[in-house]
From Swiss-Prot:
GO terms for molecular function: structural constituent of ribosome. Keywords: Chloroplast, Plastid, Ribonucleoprotein, Ribosomal protein. The keyword Chloroplast applies. The keyword Repressor does not apply. GO terms for biological process: translation. This is Large ribosomal subunit protein bL32c. It is found in: Plastid, Chloroplast. InterPro entries: Ribosomal_bL32 (IPR002677), Ribosomal_bL32_plant/cyanobact (IPR044958), Ribosomal_zn-bd (IPR011332). Its main location: plastid. GO terms for cellular component: chloroplast; large ribosomal subunit. Belongs to the bacterial ribosomal protein bL32 family.
Amino acid sequence: MAVPKKRTSILKKRIRKNLWKKGGYWAALKAFSLAKSLATGNSKSFFCTTNK
């Protein structure tokens, strides 16, 4: 089994973790924005039928 030679520093670990978290934040923001546009009817990327 491959074993790393040296321990990853806390700073590197924190940077990588924050980058990973930031990706999730942007995905959630995009999803929320899309949901808002669908709710208000301003969406240009989705065609949704409204039941009257």
